Design a protein with these regions (language model features):
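ABC ATPase NBD coupling module
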Residues: 64-78, 102, 107-108
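Conserved ABC transporter NBD signature motif
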Residues: 56-64, 73, 113
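Short helical segment in ABC ATPase nucleotide-binding domains corresponding to the A-loop/adjacent helical element
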Residues: 93-101, 111, 115
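The feature captures the beta-strand-to-loop junction immediately N-terminal to the Walker
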Residues: 33-35
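Helix-to-loop junction immediately C-terminal to a conserved catalytic motif
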Residues: 48
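Conserved ABC ATPase "signature" region
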Residues: 108-127
Length: 151
């Protein structure tokens, strides 16, 4: 669960977020949409502590993110941005498995999870895992970005 409790963010004199409160229950998919400059990216960057709130508290799993080790916090989450951010020199499999591999996750569990995620995003692993991002459509790249975020 992610919870924002009366979060505000100001850059100089520019108030980007004002007294934002919401809860995202575990397992939910959430899309943040809005006009340019309304605070979407700022909100995401506050969740993983790239930006500190001016006021309010943010909790993940009931724990204040300020009390969490920043590296562990960032490694424990993934989110999909508008640009896919896939590594063009890596295959789809390598893109999905990069974070688990860097985190020294069990290789067999990682392979199994990759297959599960390909199913989740509706892409045949036999057809796509050995392809490179440049061989995929924009929508397919976005789905691989979703799979990587959940890896």
């Amino acid at each position: 669960m992610i919870q924002f409790d009366h979060v505000s963010k100001t850059f100089g004199k520019n108030q980007v977020l004002s007294d934002v409160t919401f809860t995202i229950d575990q397992g939910n998919f959430v899309t943040i949409i809005g006009a340019s400059g309304c605070g979407k990216t700022t909100t995401l960057k506050m969740i993983n502590r790239l930006i500190k709130p001016t006021a309010g508290e943010i909790y993940i799993g009931g724990e204040n993110i300020r009390d969490k080790d920043i590296l562990q916090l960032r490694r424990s989450m993934g989110y999909v941005i508008q640009q896919t951010g896939l590594f063009s020199h890596m295959t789809v499999r390598e893109n999905i498995e990069i974070i688990p591999r860097l985190s020294k996750a069990d290789p067999e569990r990682t392979r199994t999870r990759t297959l599960e995620l390909m199913d989740l995003v509706g892409m045949d692993p036999n057809q796509y895992l050995d392809r490179y991002p440049t061989e995929l459509s924009g929508g397919q790249q976005q789905r691989i970005g979703v799979a990587r975020a959940f890896a």
